[in-house]
């Protein structure tokens, strides 16, 4: 990328003017070209001993090249990243913003300051955005593809496969694993890596035998408290890298009498307080992934003991319930207004709103918040579903809730 094309006229006067900007822009091309030439001259069969002049010269050159980008004036760096961030609001162009954060530490810190969280920008940029609450106004629109043969579910950013095409951004993937006591969905940042020991592992969804109760686990502690009591933790079998935290419970109402009607569900968000949707309410967003794989192994008693310290768990969590549909006499079916995002009737379709009645009348929750759809999910074609979510839940939480709708529930229908 030619950085000189991104500069406004006023930036040409900063720290040496156009000549310095041109040199900086051209240096990146020279760095890449020289490295490829050096590799070609040495060949794959050449082995450089440790401490040799070759390795020392390479480290010197890398340090020199690194300093070129570090020494950019902050005003100029801010202006460059702001222009890239404003011009690339959609994927795959959004990759340029991610590339800015990969140059060096100073670029990464500046990019983190410029790029806002999804709650404010309505955009998903970094992997951590998948754990941050969605926007308050317009929802983030996604779609899910189901592969029946492999039991894999993939979440993409976009309106639909037909409209997004090859520009669809893969956000999360889940693989269904059958257990003797129920089903388990392993959620990953990758499309084909579902190992719990992998850095792509983000969490899981586990069901009971009847498929009426689901528990959402995350491998990162909630941002409001890095130390949770034993009731909110799952003891790892091997090491602390496989630690899981109970962040939500999904309950489907039993239909013992087999009466006619849609499914009824309730979601208890253990990591989101009811105050998040109150007037002036906020929720703390995670800012980074904690690398638990580098931590030392801990004995199981550390997770089972009650002396963990930290703040208390949320006493009044946010509760979501499915919006009651209306019966359409002419169509002879239950209907909800999905505003064109759902086109095929299915028992899996639902809309979730805040259960204000269960929270009590004195919770100071505005009426518009009580009627606002926080998550909606529905079918638009064979093995294709839409998922739209908004504040205060994250993409991972929304995806986990939608995955629960795919599991078979013979006693709930």
UniProtKB/Swiss-Prot annotation:
- Gene3D superfamilies on file: 1.20.1280.50, Tubby Protein, Chain A (3.20.90.10)
**What species does this protein belong to?**
Arabidopsis thaliana (Mouse-ear cress)
- Top-level taxon in the UniProt lineage: Eukaryota
From which lineage does this chain's organism come?
A: Eukaryota, Viridiplantae, Streptophyta, Embryophyta, Tracheophyta
SUPFAM superfamilies to which the protein is assigned, alphabetical: F-box domain, Tubby C-terminal domain-like
Family according to the record = Belongs to the TUB family.
Q: Where is the F-box domain?
A: 67-122
InterPro entries named among the record's database cross-references: F-box-like_dom_sf (IPR036047), F-box_dom (IPR001810), Tubby-like_C (IPR025659), Tubby_C (IPR000007), Tubby_C_CS (IPR018066)
Q: What is the name listed in the Swiss-Prot or TrEMBL entry for this protein?
A: Tubby-like F-box protein 6
Q: Which gene encodes it?
A: TULP6
What is the tissue localization of expression for this protein? Ubiquitous, with higher levels in flowers.
- Which GO BP terms, alphabetically? pollen development; regulation of DNA-templated transcription
Which GO molecular-function terms appear in the entry? transcription cis-regulatory region binding
Q: Tell me the Pfam families matching this sequence.
A: F-box-like, Tub
């Amino acid at each position: 990328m030619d950085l000189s094309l991104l500069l406004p006229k006023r930036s040409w006067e900063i720290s040496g003017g156009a000549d310095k900007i041109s040199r900086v822009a051209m240096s990146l091309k020279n760095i890449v070209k020289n490295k490829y030439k050096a590799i070609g001259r040495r060949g794959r069969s050449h082995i450089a001993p440790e401490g040799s002049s070759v390795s020392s010269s390479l480290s010197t050159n890398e340090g020199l090249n690194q300093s070129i980008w570090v020494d950019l004036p902050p005003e100029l760096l801010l202006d460059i990243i702001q222009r890239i961030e404003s011009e690339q609001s959609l994927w795959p162009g959004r990759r340029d913003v991610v590339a800015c954060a990969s140059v060096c530490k100073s670029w990464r810190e500046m990019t983190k300051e410029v790029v806002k969280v999804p709650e404010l920008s309505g955009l998903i940029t970094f992997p951590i955005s998948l754990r941050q609450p969605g926007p308050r106004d317009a929802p983030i629109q996604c779609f899910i593809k189901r592969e029946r043969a492999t039991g894999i579910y993939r979440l993409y950013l976009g309106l639909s496969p037909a409209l997004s095409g090859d520009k669809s951004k893969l956000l999360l993937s889940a693989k269904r694993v059958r257990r003797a006591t129920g089903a388990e969905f392993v959620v990953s940042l990758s499309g084909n890596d579902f190992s719990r020991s992998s850095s792509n592992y983000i969490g899981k969804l586990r069901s009971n035998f009847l498929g009426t109760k689901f528990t959402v686990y995350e491998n990162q502690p909630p941002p409001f408290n890095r130390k949770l009591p034993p009731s909110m933790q799952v003891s790892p079998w091997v090491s602390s890298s496989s630690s899981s935290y109970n962040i939500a419970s999904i309950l489907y109402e039993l239909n013992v009498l087999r009466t006619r009607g849609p499914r009824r569900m309730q979601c208890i968000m253990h990591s989101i307080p009811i105050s998040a949707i109150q007037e002036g309410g906020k929720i703390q967003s995670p800012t980074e992934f904690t690398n638990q794989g580098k931590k030392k192994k801990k004995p199981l008693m550390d997770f089972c003991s009650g002396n963990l310290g930290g703040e208390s768990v949320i006493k009044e969590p946010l509760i979501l319930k499915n919006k009651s549909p209306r019966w359409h006499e002419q169509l002879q079916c239950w209907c909800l207004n999905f505003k064109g995002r759902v086109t095929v009737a299915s028992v899996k379709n639902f809309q979730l709103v805040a259960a204000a009645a269960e929270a009590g009348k004195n919770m100071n929750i505005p009426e518009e918040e009580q009627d606002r759809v926080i998550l909606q999910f529905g079918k638009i074609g064979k093995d294709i579903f839409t998922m739209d979510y908004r504040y205060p839940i994250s993409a991972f939480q929304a995806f986990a809730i939608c995955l629960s709708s795919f599991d078979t529930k013979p006693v709930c229908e």
